[in-house]
């Protein structure tokens, strides 16, 4: 996955890619690959608590701030960012949104797609995003699609680590050494000021997964790592 030429990361909310996949994004772009980040929502309702402490806050202003934060974080990592702005808590994905996602996947033709786990009892938006991404990926590459539409080579599908992996059925199959690019992940996390409380937590997770990566690989130089679960068979 480190050497993928084209990577697509799809999150339910604007900041999801930063906590869960900033490292692999930076690794891919460092090696000359291209990464696109898509957020289905800005997380304006359920994931912008710090911003709502302002009694004069508005939904549109929260969206603006989250867009600026996510765009800045993506730029730090060498990626592009776009948001479908579907609205969160609850996220609703209709046929039009699914078509939009399918067309984007067809246009980007990614080698690898990373998204949420299929289960998350603590966040109803994440499983919906995961299901939509998997369905759109199949529609973009499936032989059953009408011949009037172009299709692409199927992408490898991975799931990034949720905040509570034990409750989401997350079993890591792939560890990525992000030690060399961890300063970039730190900068990207710092750009997401609306969720600053997650910075230290995600740093500790990267150290925790590095310990697993060292044991599995035998490499003693891994200081920070990200964990992923492969869906598509090899």
What are these regions (language model features)?
Residues 1-108:
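Active-site rim/loop-helix segments in enzyme catalytic domains that contact anionic ligands
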Residues 1-8, 91-234:
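Metal-dependent de-N-acetylase/amidase catalytic core
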